[in-house]
Amino acid sequence: ISVSVGKGMTEIFKELGVDYLIEGGQTMNPSTEDMLNAIAKVNAKTIYIFPNNKNIVLAANQARDLTEDKEIVVVPTKTIPQGITAMISYVPEKNSAENIEAMLQAIEHVKTGQITYAVRDTRIDDKEIHEGDMMGIGDHGILAVGKDRMEVAKETVAQMVDDESEVISIYYGADTEEAEAEELATALEEAYPDCDVEL
């Protein structure tokens, strides 16, 4: 069971073998009841739940605690990329203890950055932000602020990439043109030749 946002991400999770998807998002966090309904619909003795948002982990844990007839394993994924990485690490032949260990190790190495618009003037992490500015938000705060989406995206990635980075995955929403995403991918390939860039 995975929480997902949007059609594109839902397709990715389906391709990775997720049996049941719950629509989520910043303003619509699934409840414990939503989780229990999903658990009831999945015909399996062991069910893995990927919350993919730190605000949903509690609901998933409560659903696990309220379920007695199935083994529920909550993988504490806090972002969609962590959820995707955890699913890729899943091996059906392994038991739940082996799988959770592999998944936890895998998500430990995932860094997530998001590019979004500022909805109001504010000051966060010593950065002056104005309504309409582009912001690059990482796992631990604001990484970049600016007027140009492409430049903010590049700076956000620059703040996250280190010597251990191997793969840079770009997921883009409906309001981003494919050509713009391809331009970013090309720029990142040139800037980080030791990393695989996926679009």
Task: Name every feature range the model reports, one short phrase each.
Residues 1-199:
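N-terminal loops that bind phosphate or other acidic moieties
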